[in-house]
A protein has these predicted regions:
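Alpha-helical transmembrane segments and their immediate juxtamembrane cytosolic regions
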Residues: 1-340
Length: 340
């Protein structure tokens, strides 16, 4: 199979995305978390659709996705779980609720969800066979499916308790974001080739819009444990605002990444982080836990907004610095852990 050249600005965008994931799992001012959670997980689905290339759904395709997405999920989930045999079935089920019951790292919900979304999106692309209007019909069906799943979750106690296997309800939403990413590429490439000043203006305007709209969309129930929208638990608030914020900010961040790639010469570390975002997703929680023990010992305490942001920046640096040797060791000795 012909190897596709990586787009540096996509790796820049993955760096931005995984950085937001890290900050999103810290104690930060509520406004910061509300803004981050408005779009940071949809961004990764958008980027997947953005980099899509035509391929048949055959054994080779499925085995590659199992190796690069599902196997890393299983291995990391088993590493972080309590080690009880009963945990294995919950991990294989793959929902966020089941991972919580298994006592493993719930942020891993994204991987089985992403795996299912990739398959759904590939099915959509294989069905349309060049008839792009059919893709809009498929998007409508995906959204209807997501609404039905959301209704059943509220009506069926078992679904409410365990969630859907592979977070299938969120995978339907993820596939919609992938479709958006597929169309975004044509627009971004047009901006990139001819209209850089217009791209700058567009990015600024989109940031301005979502700096307001991200704060007016709250989940239906203001649960103190989830005071903001959150894709992992299906807390969307107003669905229209959720999709608008996620799509506009994803487009803005891709545009910002294009500009960053053009303007910044030395960015090896940024590209390295973006290219290894999967590993960082899987290990950053453990490093953050260690960092939370270190920060008070170096005098970084306090609960004010400024103090929390400073602690967050220092913790972020610790995560990146400690992730680098972990990434290199995994690549050298256990590449299968990250699907290599």
């Amino acid at each position: 199979m012909e190897k596709v050249k990586r787009l540096d600005y996509v790796d820049v965008c993955k760096w931005l995305g995984i950085s937001l994931v890290i900050f999103g799992h810290m104690k930060m001012p509520g406004e910061v978390l509300q803004w981050i959670y408005a779009f940071h997980m949809p961004l990764f689905f958008v980027l997947s659709g953005y980099t899509y290339r035509a391929q048949r759904i055959d054994k080779e395709f499925l085995m590659k996705k199992i190796k690069t997405i599902y196997v890393p999920f299983l291995l990391f989930a088993l590493i972080f779980c309590r080690g009880e045999m009963s945990s294995w079935a919950y991990i294989a089920y793959g929902s966020r609720n089941a991972l919580d019951i298994a006592g493993t790292y719930t942020v891993l919900w994204f991987l089985p969800c992403f795996f299912a979304a990739v398959i759904l999106f590939a099915l959509c692309m294989n069905i349309i066979k060049g008839k792009k209007w059919l893709l809009l019909v498929e998007v409508a069906l995906l959204l209807v499916g997501a609404v039905v799943c959301d209704y059943l979750k509220g009506a069926q106690p078992m679904i409410a308790k365990y969630g859907y296997p592979f977070n299938f309800d969120m995978a339907l939403i993820g596939a919609v974001f992938m479709v958006a990413g597929y169309y975004f590429k044509q627009i971004i490439e047009w901006f990139n080739s001819k209209k850089q000043l217009l791209l700058i203006a567009t990015v600024v305007v989109l940031f301005a819009i979502t700096s307001y709209t991200a704060f007016i969309n709250l989940p239906e129930s203001l649960n103190p444990a989830c005071p903001h929208v959150e894709m992992s638990v299906g807390a969307f608030g107003n669905w229209g605002l959720f999709f608008m914020n996620a799509l506009l900010m994803s487009f803005a961040l891709i545009g910002l990444s294009v500009l960053f790639d053009k303007w910044v010469g030395k960015k090896k570390l940024v590209l390295f982080i973006g290219q290894n975002s999967l590993t960082i997703l899987c290990v950053h929680g453990t490093i953050l836990l260690a960092a939370s023990k270190v920060l008070p010992k170096i005098g970084l305490t306090g609960v004010g907004d400024g103090a929390l942001i400073l602690q967050g920046v220092v913790a972020y640096v610790i995560v990146i610095v400690m992730s680098i040797p972990v990434i290199l060791l995994i690549k050298r000795f256990v590449p299968n852990l990250v699907g290599k």
